[in-house]
Amino acid sequence: MSRIGRLPIPVPKGVQVQVSPGLVKVKGPKGELSVPVSPELKVVVEENVVRVERPSDERRHRSLHGLTRTLIANAVKGVSEGYVKELLIKGIGYRARLVGRSIELTVGFSHPVVVEPPEGITFEVPEPTRIRVLGIDKQKVGQVAADIRAIKKPSAYHEKGIYYADEPVRLKPGKAGAKK
């Protein structure tokens, strides 16, 4: 049995889980998400717990078991609490500002870069050097944060670029220089 797959998913108050063939809909205070489920797996909703069961110990079923359980758990957390990914901007003159719903990045190019949020994603800029990406879909929040980071990846030699807040800053040593 998959160690992750067999764990029950606690459903907080205010969150509803509906199971239909091939789909699990999760509705909560922050919104609604649907998770596709393989027809081979069985999703059981009890009072305030959701369980995923698999028909056999085939490799394919074991893989789908843990994956499906995690996707449903992420959806439950997303509609109840939401997800946040924080980015830091480092570099002289590098900054971000909120323009309507989108953000405008000044990161060393000859022009500012404007990033439009996809549906279900919002941006916050608490400081000119910090960006917060918020949403209920974990995958979408992570992808948008990765797209923003890719605009100006962290430099290997200088502490410049867009970093995840929890990302360690790794700098390579520069040239050793000529000895006298």
Curated annotation (Swiss-Prot):
GO terms for molecular function: rRNA binding; structural constituent of ribosome. Keywords: Ribonucleoprotein, Ribosomal protein, RNA-binding, rRNA-binding. It comes from the Bacteria. Gene3D superfamilies: Ribosomal protein L6, alpha-beta domain. One of its GO terms (cellular component) is cytosolic large ribosomal subunit. GO terms for biological process: cytoplasmic translation. Part of the 50S ribosomal subunit. This protein binds to the 23S rRNA, and is important in its secondary structure. It is located near the subunit interface in the base of the L7/L12 stalk, and near the tRNA binding site of the peptidyltransferase center. NCBIfam families: L6_bact. Belongs to the universal ribosomal protein uL6 family. This is Large ribosomal subunit protein uL6. It comes from Thermus aquaticus. The gene is rplF.
